[in-house]
Amino acid sequence: MEVPIAAMTFAHPANVMTLASRQPKSKRSHISPATTAHRNLQTRLAHHHHATPASLPMAICNTVDKVINRFIDLPEQRPTVDPRRVLSGNFAPVDELPPTSCHVIRGSIPSCLAGGVYIRNGPNPQHRLPQRTHHLFDGDGMLHSLLIPSASSTLLSEPVLCSRYVHTYKYLLERETGGPVLPNFFAGFHGVAGLARAVVMIARVLAGQINLNKGFGLANTSITLFADCLYALCESDLPYSMHINPANGEVTTLGRCDFGGDLSFRMTAHPKKDPVTMELFAFRYNVFQPFITYFWFDRAGSKVADVPILSLQKPSVMHDFAITERYAIFPESQLIVNPMDMVMRGSSLVGLDRTMVPRIGVLPRYAKDESDMRWFEVPRFNMLHTTNGWEEADGEEIVLVAPNILSIEHMLGNMELMRARVDMVRINLCTGDVSCTALSPESLEFGVIHQGYVGRKNRYGYFGVSGPLPKIKGIRKLDFDLVGSGDCTVGRRDFGLGCFAGEPFFVPDNIDGYGNEDSGYVVCYTHEEDTGESWFVVMDAKSPELDIVAEVQLPSRIPYGFHGIFVKQAELLAQQ
């Protein structure tokens, strides 16, 4: 039985909704027809933004929620989820920004970026200072999109920034009601208060205020391009299809996508697209068995049947995974979901199990079941994000490069205390031998590579330097061929005192995406905390100092967020 993590006990059949009147081109669409109820909701929101008067059941639920927040689970009693702390500085939300021109204040933007768009996703709660506990991961999704003008553009002469919320069902519902309705998953489910919030949520469902068929996720984590469609992702819901207007940079939510009814539950925020076959590989994790379900899509977007994985020991929080040409690789960490601990011990829904030994599971990439699944113990290896995986020795050895979270107990609390070390794990499939080698002495996370090498042996990775996490104070380029040297760093860029960035992204400088692996540019948003200004920065990936070749001053502050991508002009024009 599949159970949505954020709702704990509610079944979640997909019911896809189109959120914009724009219809796709003649290519196959992954978005099902709109429901009448959602069209009515969208119409109401188009005419007004003020809160809808509460019905009696809704008013009762709202009152109980306030009692929980003010007398049972006070934010000030749990500083790590106090919104006054969590949403301070550049973690504070910003307003939406319509397409707005920006100025290139340094250098010139490389031609390989012309006509393309850099998009970064991240949390941005629509209710500025929530009157309840709040974790950074609980904010509504907002895309910050920077469109670079093409050489032939007659409409744009400068880059254009646009910041828009992803119009999830949760976002629209809480925008209409004027306040929080669905509980925060990471901060809200804690002890007696968490149980009480679950009861209130059940009451809201029974009263018809919440329709779980329409989802409850945030779409605040990442964005991916697959089969000519852009998707905003979060592991608590289905993907949301997005559109970036290549003429003016406007960002539009098209709808919640179930891939023609084949994807009936949520999906990881970190699917892997094979750059050769163009297939997309993904999974979801769950509170009850099967804890992990694996699946993939062909290059046209058709989903293959689920592969339930029942050999997982406990409901481990599995945020990311990796693929090689022949295998899918799953990391089992010590971070687990345990509803009974919340109920019986008054702890959080997600916690640390120090008795567990982390494992890595290896499954044939096109497996129809888990009969050939193998698990390998990797002590003290707790992975949140993967960088890449590949095979060596004619497929007898698996290599995985990933930041190892050395203090994973802080991930859901004092994130600034987290330290991550980039490790290379080697698994010999014949002997069962496992080794783990550090690639740098620094605390590095948010690693990216040339996307043309996903699942295949590559040499270079670009990582954010903890500033502390989740802020990034610099970028490091690692050469994986130097493994065993103690420090594989071959390129470095520090942003300076008080200047921080988000996850970098590598953009190859050649049209087809191949050639010299590090021939291209590293891009990201940066923020100067003293002045409150934000920039888009382009760095030469080949230079030892990751020299800045272009800098764009942005008209709005970009809060610290999560993951992003760069979509080249041809891909942008081909999107559905």
UniProtKB/Swiss-Prot annotation:
Catalyzed reactions per annotation: a 9-cis-epoxycarotenoid + O2 = a 12'-apo-carotenal + 2-cis,4-trans-xanthoxin; 9-cis-violaxanthin + O2 = (3S,5R,6S)-5,6-epoxy-3-hydroxy-5,6-dihydro-12'-apo-beta-caroten-12'-al + 2-cis,4-trans-xanthoxin; 9'-cis-neoxanthin + O2 = (3S,5R,6R)-3,5-dihydroxy-6,7-didehydro-5,6-dihydro-12'-apo-beta-caroten-12'-al + 2-cis,4-trans-xanthoxin
Residues the entry annotates as binding Fe cation: H270, H319, H385, H563
EC number: 1.13.11.51
Chain segment of the transit peptide: 1-34
GO cellular component: chloroplast stroma
Molecular-function GO term, any one: 9-cis-epoxycarotenoid dioxygenase activity
Induction behaviour: Down-regulated by submergence. Induced by drought stress. Down-regulated by glucose.
Record has Transit peptide as a keyword: yes
Keyword entries, A-Z: Abscisic acid biosynthesis, Chloroplast, Dioxygenase, Iron, Metal-binding, Oxidoreductase, Plastid, Stress response, Transit peptide
Purpose: Has a 11,12(11',12') 9-cis epoxycarotenoid cleavage activity. Catalyzes the first step of abscisic-acid biosynthesis from carotenoids.
Family affiliation: Belongs to the carotenoid oxygenase family.
Listed name of the protein: 9-cis-epoxycarotenoid dioxygenase NCED2, chloroplastic
Name of the gene: NCED2
